[in-house]
Regions:
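Alpha-helical transmembrane segments of multi-pass membrane proteins predominantly involved
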Residues: 1-207
Length: 207
């Protein structure tokens, strides 16, 4: 089995950065939360750099072909990391010194990891993992606004996310039953021979 976890270095950097910010921020006083922001920015810059360097080489696959690193993946990784870095810069003025400042940065990094996984996935199961990792932290970010309005918004976001997740997994189940696998290449090869209505239902659920 071809694992090659080093190909996921940008995702690993962002994920570890999120964990460091989440755990380390709990021990930082409110007036030193900028350290968590700096750590998050460094993780994003490191991920963008690693993704840009990976684009210089040929297309490669990891984890038995379920994740592909190519120009499209690299471009999405760089854009995602730099966009999140921009969000950190814009949001820092609003949340600087707040009790949940480091938590917000950590959740943003975890959500960013999910988006980057989505960009490189070549298997529906990896797509599900990326979707969950990208969406679940958003519930916390919405809820961190506090108060009754924040709780209501977090609940609505959770319900919409849960519904989307159920439809996604239902669509994946249908496509797996039709194709006998979840690999994108296998789906492209076998689905043209499957009933159009069934394929449409599966694709609609995934989308």
């Amino acid at each position: 089995m071809q694992m090659r976890p080093e190909l996921l270095l940008p995702e690993i950097l962002v994920f570890l950065g999120g964990l460091v910010v989440l755990l380390g921020g709990s021990f930082l006083p409110r007036d030193r939360q900028w350290i968590a922001r700096a750590a998050a920015a460094l993780a994003l810059l490191g991920a963008a750099t690693a993704a840009a360097l990976a684009m210089a080489g040929p297309a490669q696959s990891a984890f038995s072909g379920t994740f592909t690193v190519d120009t499209a993946t690299g471009t999405a990784r760089v854009i995602t990391a730099l966009t999140t870095l921009l969000v950190l810069g814009v949001a820092s003025g609003e949340i600087a010194g707040s009790p949940r400042e480091s938590d917000t940065y950590a959740l943003l990094l975890l959500a960013t990891t999910g988006v980057m996984v989505l960009a490189g996935s070549t298997d529906l199961l990896v797509l599900i993992v990326g979707f969950l990792l990208a969406s679940i932290p958003l519930y916390g970010i919405v809820g961190l606004t506090g108060g009754r309005a924040g709780a209501e918004a977090a609940m609505k976001t959770y319900l919409m996310g849960a519904l989307s997740g159920i439809l996604l997994m239902l669509g994946v189940t249908v496509l797996y039953a039709l194709a006998g696998g979840t690999d994108y290449a296998l789906l492209q090869e076998t689905l043209p021979a499957a009933p159009d209505a069934d394929v449409g239902a599966g694709v609609l659920g995934v989308l």
